[in-house]
Amino acid sequence: MQKPLKLTFIADTHHYSKTLGTSGRQYELRSGSDQKCLAETGEIIDAAFEKIANSDTDFVLIAGDVSNDGELVSHIEFKKKLDRLAKKKKIYLITATHDWCCDENPRKFDGDTVSNDVETMPSFKLYPFYEEYTINDAIAKYETHLGTYSYVVQLSDKVRLLALNDDQNGKGRAGFKPKHFEWIDEQLKKA
């Protein structure tokens, strides 16, 4: 008999790089209007990943939003954290709308000034960037119109992970296009 798989699931880390600013009136207004601990996300993620690395979990499943608003610097920092965790655990990741800044409003704070001149990660670059944690082990994958993916991974003889990306339904809202639903249905039948 196969031992049961142990999975750890994390979602919505919203990693925010401190290089984007963590003080000043504009930052305080932004931070105070949100339940996220923006300035502390790095330390919170590090503590969680350390605990997971030292646990007996077999796989780590991470669902986006992994970055706060798609900021390239936040993705680069988050990937370094993933790389450290990956030395001890197998990771599977799926991105979401904040990972490519769907609202086109990335922000940087400097005192009383807020600016939007922040380099972001385009949706079609997310999967090459996170490839080793996404589609590398996929037995099936579906590329969306945004260049993001849903994918299937065989975790064991009897367990498949269906990682679904519902970034847009083609009507400006989160969801799936009809062809994507067909692919999902096909994967469920194969499982």
Predicted segments with their positions:
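N-terminal active-site segment of His-dependent metallophosphoesterases
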Residues: M1-L72
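Extended active-site neighborhood of metal-dependent phosphoesterases/phosphodiesterases
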Residues: L72, E77-K189
